[in-house]
Design a protein with these regions (language model features):
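Gly/Gly-Pro- and Ser/Thr-rich, intrinsically disordered tail segments characteristic of DNA damage-repair
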Residues: 1-228, 238, 365-394
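DNA-contacting surface of Y-family translesion DNA polymerases
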Residues: 184, 194-338, 356
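Short, charged/polar, Gly/Pro-enriched secondary-structure boundary elements
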Residues: 112-114, 156, 300, 352-359
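A short glycine-rich, hydrophobically flanked beta-strand micro-motif that places a catalytic Asp/Glu
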Residues: 135, 139, 287-293, 342-345
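Short, well-ordered strand-loop elements centered on a beta-strand within folded domains, enriched
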Residues: 36-38, 161-164, 300-307, 355-361
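Short, internal active-site loops enriched in acidic
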Residues: 109-110, 141-146, 294-299, 349-354
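Short connector loops at helix/strand junctions that flank enzyme active sites
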Residues: 22-24, 100, 284-286, 308, ...
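Acidic, metal-coordinating catalytic segment for phosphate/diphosphate chemistry
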Residues: 309, 313-394
């Protein structure tokens, strides 16, 4: 059995924890540089505020009550996520952090001493008393069914935020799946759900009753695995250690439009520096560095321009100096004067766990001497609270 604990309206709830005066008031959290809405409290949702709504539009809208907006504070959200994780680990021996606000728990054998839903209520109270955050808990014999149960616990308040789908109550599971739209199933996106709908499959129960071989032939092995999971066959195990990332992206929308190359170069260098820090945090090396720039697609009076360029390195690196240099070379290939740029970013790909590659004695490019040691010292200073060391390109 698995349980999925999901923090309700996570970003907005984190802001409310430290502002008791905002209880029952509509709160939204804005993206980097206050570009658009990325999180809403339940009260804000009831006002009809949509995800992705630009801040300048929201600011001019009229509501029956004031809407409180916060700039995103990712350090706070990471800290609160870690606190939730710690409290869950106090009651469950094996926990997987699926996302910043979702955690899977292995709860096999729990029912020998406590009812599953009673345990879910215990989890809710333990997290609420320790962090001030409210979680919803869904339980099932597979991860997909636990996710479906968690969806239902949010959809119908009468469950009190806790719902268990057990192997001994097949009728309850089938009833829930008959009410769950296929697009709400974990791992089924909008594109796949549209194709399923054309085949007459509109609910989770209909998908569960589909032939797995037919699904694999017409879609892929991932959707076939989902079908098996909906039927109680566990195909996705708990990952206590998160898998290594395949890509790192650092980007930001500008508060004011960027019109000069120097300002853009500084922004790209800053993104490249942060991406390199994340790369070392993953204990990875990369060979592929890409930079993208674009103007606002909403600026009707200005021509739209967006472009991306990439650099492939001969030697995998995690050295900030190499990554910044490659990012600047990529920027030089996409920069065009005369535009008012709204966003830029840096992406790292093609990861390897070590920086070792086959070299030629006559290669012009050789690995930097003592590069890893220098980066370790740099990261140690920046994370120690003693100060901040950065590169001159910023």
């Amino acid at each position: 059995m698995y349980a999925l604990a999901d923090v309700n309206s996570f970003y907005a709830s984190c802001e409310k924890v430290f502002r008791p005066d905002l209880r029952n008031k509509p709160v939204v959290v804005l993206s980097n540089n206050d570009g658009c809405v990325i999180a809403r409290s339940p009260e804000a949702k009831r006002l009809g505020i949509k995800m992705g709504l630009p801040w300048f539009q929201l600011r001019s809208m009229k509501f029956p009550v004031p809407v409180i907006a916060f700039s995103s504070n990712y350090a706070l959200y990471a800290s609160m996520s870690n606190r939730v994780m710690v409290h869950l680990e106090e009651l469950a021996p094996r926990v997987e952090q699926y996302s910043i606000d979702e955690m899977f728990l292995d709860i096999r054998g729990i029912d020998s001493c406590i009812d599953f839903e009673d345990f879910g209520r215990q989890l809710r109270e333990h997290v609420r008393s320790g962090t001030g955050l409210t979680i919803g808990v869904g339980m099932g014999p597979t991860k997909t069914l636990a996710k479906s149960a968690q969806w239902a616990s949010k959809e119908w308040p009468q469950f009190g935020g806790v719902l268990a789908l057990t192997p001994g109550n097949i009728r309850r599971t089938e009833k829930l799946l008959s009410l769950q739209p296929v697009e709400e199933i974990w791992g089924v996106g909008r594109r796949i759900s549209k194709k399923l709908n054309t085949m007459g499959i509109t609910t989770a129960l209909q998908l569960a009753r589909a032939n797995p071989t037919f699904i694999r032939k017409n879609f892929n092995v991932v959707l076939e695995r989902t079908v098996r999971e909906l039927n109680g066959e566990s195909c996705i195990s708990l990952e206590e250690a998160p898998p290594p990332k395949q890509q790192i992206v650092c980007s930001r929308s500008f508060g004011e439009r960027v019109t000069t190359y120097e300002a853009m170069r500084q922004a790209v260098c800053q993104h490249a520096e942060r991406a390199a820090e994340k790369l070392r945090g993953e204990r990875q090396f990369c060979r592929h560095i890409a930079v993208f720039v674009k103007t606002s697609p909403f600026a009707v009076t200005e021509p739209y321009y967006g472009n991306m360029a990439s650099e492939k390195l001969l030697i995998p690196t995690q050295d900030t100096r190499d990554i910044i240099a490659a990012a600047v070379r990529a920027l030089d290939r996409v920069w065009m004067d005369g535009h008012r740029y709204a966003k830029a970013g840096c992406m790292l790909n093609d990861f390897t766990p070590t920086g070792v590659s086959q070299l030629n004695l006559f290669d012009e490019v050789q690995p930097r001497e003592r590069s890893e040691q220098l980066m370790q010292v740099l990261d140690g200073i920046n994370h120690s609270g003693l100060g901040k060391v950065w590169f001159a390109g910023r």
